Swiss-Prot record:
Pfam families given in the database record: DUF697
Domain of life where this protein originates: Bacteria
InterPro entries: DUF697, UPF0283
Protein keywords: Cell inner membrane, Cell membrane, Membrane, Transmembrane, Transmembrane helix
Cellular component terms (Gene Ontology): plasma membrane
Organism: Klebsiella pneumoniae (strain 342)
Similarity section: Belongs to the UPF0283 family.
Bilayer disposition of the protein: Multi-pass membrane protein
UniProt entry tagged with the keyword Zinc-finger: no
Name of the molecule in the record: UPF0283 membrane protein KPK_3110
Spans through the membrane: 70-90, 99-119, 213-233
Length: 353
């Protein structure tokens, strides 16, 4: 049997044809555009946080005012006048054979020379820290470049600055993995995968140890002044050790860039100490609650120490972070909590024995 015919369907309006988007014209890249081409990157939360911190830092950075320039010019003129007057005194003392005055001029010249040498050393260290930022920018450009021939010498210079010998196993593996036909991007990527993790692992161990010591010290110390002094000393020592690992010798002025985070860490220790004391006196909790508050305070200070170490790594590291190489604060938090729990358990079991 044949199937019955279906009823007719009437549409209210005419059917609209499916719109097909027009094809875009092809674009051909020349050699120069191909070398400078870089794919767009997705902005992650950490990058947004770093951008926000950069904006805040640029706002808080003091601007050069006219009064500051006038003071600098006045100090420069005063310094030149002192040097000229010293030369004149020395010449007069030599002509009049005033040996006491001549000895004083020589002593003053030695002191001024020592001061100039110290300033020159500080300037050289500050220039070295700024040069590390330029090297990091150069490495970032190489990671997006298809050129050949520059990356090997660049990476060898980084290894020499870090104090790695040519016979180091990581450096030998890197030499075995590269060849002349590889681009600069591939050579720098291999260096970041084979050699740089050796230094990063040492820096991570330094950060973990300093954070753990800060946590345990604050958890057991009853004095806020001792906490603040200990954190200041440990954080400054951590900055110096991380900079030394990456081949940078920090001076006074170059250390000022990181010293603000040290002050933040110190302020946190003192403020949290005050909050703990006031809160515990007001709530009249028992000794166990006090111990829990001390442990929480120690973990907070240890996390700030770890954050300081991560910031120091970012400033002293010669290569930018690639993929998931950047250490996360959550990893140190888990380590600190585990170490603190183990220490508290040992302290509870020891009196029972």
């Amino acid at each position: 049997m044949s199937e019955p015919l279906k009823p007719r369907i009437d549409f209210d309006g005419p059917l609209q044809a499916e719109k097909i988007p027009p094809l875009k014209s092809a674009r051909a890249f020349d050699t120069l555009e191909a070398d400078n081409f870089a794919p767009a990157r997705l902005v992650t939360g950490e990058e947004e946080e770093g951008a926000a911190e950069a904006v805040v830092e640029s706002v808080l950075r003091p601007k050069r005012s006219l009064w500051r320039r006038m003071v600098s010019a006045g100090l420069a003129i005063f310094g030149v006048s002192v040097v000229a007057q010293g030369v004149q005194w020395t010449a007069n003392a030599w002509q009049t054979q005033d040996w006491i005055a001549l000895g004083g001029c020589v002593a003053g010249a030695l002191i001024v020379g020592a001061g100039v040498g110290s300033v020159a050393t500080e300037w050289r260290r500050l220039w070295r820290l700024r040069q590390r930022a330029h090297e990091r920018d150069e490495a970032r450009d190489m990671l997006h470049s298809h050129a050949v021939g520059k990356a090997k010498a660049f990476c060898e210079k980084l290894a020499q600055q870090a104090g790695l010998d040519q016979s180091h196993p990581a450096l030998q593996r890197w030499y075995a993995a590269i060849h002349e036909t590889q681009s600069d991007r591939e050579v720098v990527s291999l260096y970041a995968q084979l050699v740089q993790p050796v230094l990063d692992a040492q820096a991570r161990r330094e950060i973990s140890r300093s954070a753990a010591e800060s946590t345990l010290m604050i958890a057991v110390s009853p004095l806020a002044l001792v906490d603040m002094a200990f954190i200041a000393w440990r954080n400054l020592r951590l900055i110096n050790r991380i900079a030394t690992l990456y081949g940078i010798e920090l001076g006074y002025y170059s250390r000022l860039r990181l010293f603000r985070l040290v002050l933040l860490n110190i302020a946190f220790a003192g403020a949290s100490e005050l909050v703990r004391e006031v809160g515990m006196d007001w709530m009249s909790q028992d000794l166990a609650a006090r111990l829990s508050a001390r442990a929480a305070q120690g973990i907070g200070a240890g996390l700030l120490t770890a954050r300081l170490g991560i910031k120091a790594m970012e400033l002293c590291r010669p290569l930018p972070w690639i993929a998931d190489d950047k250490p996360r604060l959550g990893d140190f938090r888990r380590e600190l909590i585990g170490q603190l729990k183990e220490t508290l358990q040992k302290s509870k079991t020891s009196p029972e024995k």
